[in-house]
Amino acid sequence: IFIQVILPLRLEWEPFYYQEIELSESAGDASGLFPVTSTGSVTERDKEQVRVGDRVRVNFAGKEYVGVVSMADAGKQAEEMGIVDKVKPILGMAEGLEPVTKEEIELWRHIAEYYLCTVGEVYKAAYPAQKVEKEVVQARQEALKVEREEKNRTKIADKIKRLEERAEKKAELAAKARKSESRERYLAEKEMLEGEIGLLVRELTSMVGELCRTTGSVTGYGDSVTYHQDEEPIGGSIIETSEGTEKEISLSAAQEEAYSKIKEIFAKGKPALLHGVTGSGKTEIYLKLAQETLAMGKNVLYLVPEIALSRQLEDRISETFPELLVFHSGETMSRKREVATVLRHAGEPAEGKGYVVLGTRSAIFLPHKNLGLVIVDEEHDTSYKQDSPAPRYNGRETAIMMAKIFGANVILGSATPSLESLYNCSVGRYGLVTLNKRFYDAADSDIEIIDTIAERRKNGMIGNFSRKLIEHIGKCLGEHRQVLILRERRAYSPIVQCQECGEIPKCRCCNVSLSLHRRAEGSERLVCHYCGRVYEYTGKCHKCGGELKPLGSGTQKIEEEASKLFPNARIARLDSDTAQSRKYETDTIRKFSNGEIDILIGTRMVAKGFDFSGLSLVAVLQADSILGQEDYRADERGLQLLEQFRGRCGRRGEKGLFVIQTSQPEHPVYQSIDGKLDENGTMARFLGERKLFGYPPYSRVIGVVIKDYNQARVDLLSRDLGEYLRGALAVKVSLAPGVQNGPNVIGPYSPAIDKISNQNIRQIRVLLPKDRSLARNK
C-alpha cells in the first residue's frame, strides 16, 4: 500500500513509502495495489492499513523519523512518477503517538503556503518531540530533577534543624552567663544563627513552591508519558478547577450593546474586532461569548501574547468557568501532552461539555476538536509573531485561518488595534465594534509631557527624574497609591565610553556596544544583549588605559536612583534579567497587584494588559528610545505601547496621571496620545503614509535575511540574490514614490546591527501586490 508521509524536515515534497498488508481470506484473490481510503469504516480487509493522520516510523537519508501520513492511496501517483521500484517500506507504526487530525494537516498546509515554508517545518513546530524514546527520556529527566530537588530540600531542612538546636543552646548559655559581655556574645551568636535560619527557610519555601508548581498536578510522574489510542482522557489532573458552578456574567449597557453587535458580525461569518479603551471591560465580553459557546458543547481557544498575562488571567477565568486548560511554554512537557490528550478525547457537541484553552500562540497547534470560538486578546501585540525558526507565522492571522477550517467564530480585541486589522474593517473583511467608555466610568488619565532638555537648563532634573515627576511620585506615595515606571532599556547603563580616547567597548562577536550590568553584591560586568557573551569589567579602557564612564541609564540605574529619592518606598524591578525566574516574575506581579510594592520599574513587559487597582501614576523615562526604530511600523508600535501603558492607571473609577519625559515634546506620536486610535484619526495618517510608499496593508512584504561568517561572501551573495529577484519578478525601476503596479525589491542593505554571533547580516525587502496569488509568491 503506497502512502505519502510528512517528515519534520525542510522538504518541498512529501516522500513515498509503502506498507505491506497480509490480506485475510475474505479478501479473495485480490492482488497488487489497492488504495487506502482516508475515511470510512474499518473492515477485515483494511483494519491494519494506515490512514491519513497516522504517525509512522520511516527511514530517510539514513536516519529514523516519525512522520505523518498525508496520503494513504498514493499508488497511482507512484506509478505515474515511475518510482514504484525505488520506494522504501515504512518501519512500522509509531507506538504510543496519537494520530494527527485532518484539520491539523489542513492548517499546516495553509501556514506553509502563506508563510513560504514547508509543511514539514510546520509539523516540526507543532510536534517538536518526534520520537517516543525522546519523550520518555525527557520525562525521566524531569523526574530526576524532582528527585534532586527533594534531596536538596531534605538537606536544607536538616540544616535548619541543626541550626535551631545550636540557637537554643546559645540562648541557654546566655541565660546562665554571669558576665554581661558573655551574655551579649551568646545573644549575638544566637541572632546570627536565627538570621541564617531565616534565609534557609525562605530558600526552602521557594523550593517547595517550585516543586508543587512542577509536579503538583501531574499523576504518575516519571512513568512512561506516551498515550495509546484506547486510553481514557486524563483531564482531571491538568484542568484548573474552582469551587462551585459557573458564575453568571453581568454586562453594563455599553457592553451589552457591543456584545449584540459582535453576535451580528458572527452571523455574517466575519471576524469581529473589539476596539475598547483600556479598562472598558473587554474581558467580560470575551467570557460571555465563551460561556455561550461552552453551552453548545464546543471548545474555546483564548490566546494571549505573553505567559505573564496567561497567569494573571487563570484565576479570573477559572472563577467564571470551573474547568480551564492552560497551555504555554512555561508548562512542563508532561502537562502540555496531557492538555493535548484531553482535547483529542473531547466529546462531541451533543454531549454538552466544552473546554476553555488559555494559551500563547503555540496553543494554535493543539489538536483542537469542536472548536467554536477563538479569542485573540491584545491582537496588536508583536509577541504573536514568530521570527525564527520557520514557520515565521503570526498567531493572529493563523488563528483566523484555523477558525475558518473549523467554522468557528473569531474575536480580536485591543485598546490599540493594529493598522492591518483597522484596514480590514474599513474594507469590510472584519466587523468593527467599539467601547469608548471605561467600565467604572472613570475619566481618561491626564497626560503631562515634560521636556527634559528645558528642565536640565533650569536645573530641574535629578538624575533621570525631573523635579515635577519627583513631586508627583511623592504625592502619590503620600496617598498610599502605586507608581509604575517604564524605561525601555535593561541593564545599568546601555554603553560605557573611555574619557580619554572615546573608545566604546563592543562585543567581539557582534557589531554592537556592550551594556554594563551590576550584580546584587555590587560586582560589575559587560554583557552583549544579542549573543549573551559576558566580559570582565575593570573600569579601564583596553586601548589606552583611560577611565571608562557609564553613559545612559537602564532599569537597574533607574531603580538605584528611585531608592535614593524615595528611601521608604517598597521598590521592585521587572525586566528580562529579573524575569528569568518565572517565580520572581509571577511573585512581583502578584505583590504589585496586592499593594505590597509601591514603585515598580520595568521594560515594556510591565505595559502589557495587567490590571492593577491601586495604580494612579505611570511614567515613561527617556521615551524617545521607544521611537525611531528601523521599521516602517515604528511610530505605530510606539504609539500602541504608550497608549497601553497609559491605560494601566486609573482603572477603578479614579483619575490617573500619565507622565512622559522626552527631549522631543512636539513629536507627532506624543501629540497623538488621546485614547482614540481609529481609522479616522491618527491611524488614518499612518495608513496614508503606508499607501504612499506601498507598504502593508496595501501590499505583502517578504523579508529576506542573508547571513554568512565571511563578509565578502555575504555581500556578493546578497547582491546576486537581489538582482535575481528583480529579474524573476520583472521589477520596473522607478524613483517616484507611491504604490507600484507590480512587485518591488528593496536592497540588499545592512541592518542597524549587521553582525551577530560572528555572522554578517544583509537584508532584502520584497513588496508584492496583495492580489498576487500565494502560490505564485512561493
Regions found by a protein language model. Give the residues of each.
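Accessory, non-ATPase domains that flank or precede helicase/AAA+ motor cores in DNA-metabolism machines
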Residues: 1-411, 426-442, 728, 737, ...
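Inter-lobe coupling/hinge segments of SF2-like helicase ATPases
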Residues: 246-252, 256-259, 268-355, 359-715, ...
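Long, largely alpha-helical accessory region at the distal end of helicase-like NTP-driven motors
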Residues: 482, 689-776
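Hydrophobic, Leu/Ile/Phe/Ala-enriched alpha-helical segments that form helix-helix packing faces
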Residues: 215, 562, 645-649, 721, ...
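Intrinsically disordered or highly flexible coil/loop and linker segments, enriched in small
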Residues: 117-121, 132, 482, 568-571, ...
